[in-house]
Amino acid sequence: MAHNNNNNINNNNNNNNNNNNNNNKNNNSEYKTNRNLLYKTILNDIENSLQSLIKPQELTNLLEDNINKLKELDGVQPTNTFGNLQNTSTNTTTTTTTTTTTTTTSSPNNNVITPNSNLKQTLSPSVLIEHLNLFGNENFEEGDDEEETSSDSDSSSSSSTSSSSSERVPSKKLKPMAKPRPGGCSICKTQETPYWRKGKDGDKTVYLCNACGLQIYKKKKKEKLSKEKHSIKNVLN
């Protein structure tokens, strides 16, 4: 009788151990998923800060929040990780502004007419999607895009002109002002831009000035970042 009782106790212990192991595996999988999402969000925040899409102080707040979430996952008490940086935020902002001013001074985009921020979008969604498919992974501020020739050569040189216009060249090699396009920019209608951004509206080719192209790129970048942050909150909650 005592032997049977011992066997029952051993079986119960084995079942409990198996249940604990399964729970640990499930918890470990969820833990890794949450950590990976937080790491990805942190990297995206840093990347957007480097591209001047978010301000240094905003980056500090975002990093503080996500690092504390990582600590909570590890069972560590959240702390004010960037507390010592709060007093120096003014100096950091000043340095960043100075750098941006220097970059703008040396950029060929000084003569670009900036579109009105309240201007209604006149492009269909397909144009914006096609535009981002063509240029979404590039840094618009460096001007790494198609160079449009402004020479008025005859038809015999049209083939060489077409070839050179599709080559990607550094911004320092771009001409001061690209050849005007019929109808101008599809958004702000300007005829003056260092170079044109090309997209598709159905079968129709449309052109965007550099300023509008940059504006669309930043807008889509912020929307993407907002969606990723929303998904992180849903997982953690």
Curated annotation (Swiss-Prot):
GO terms for biological process: regulation of DNA-templated transcription. It comes from Dictyostelium discoideum (Social amoeba). The keyword Protease does not apply. Residues 1-31, 78-119, 140-186 are annotated as: Disordered. Residues 140-151 have a biased composition (Acidic residues). The gene is gtaR. It comes from the Eukaryota. Gene3D superfamilies: Erythroid Transcription Factor GATA-1, subunit A. PROSITE patterns: GATA_ZN_FINGER_1, GATA_ZN_FINGER_2. Residues 1-28, 87-118, 152-167 have a biased composition (Low complexity). One of its GO terms (molecular function) is sequence-specific DNA binding. This is GATA zinc finger domain-containing protein 18. Keywords: Metal-binding, Zinc, Zinc-finger. A zinc finger (GATA-type) spans 185-212. The keyword Cytoplasm does not apply. It holds the Pfam family GATA.
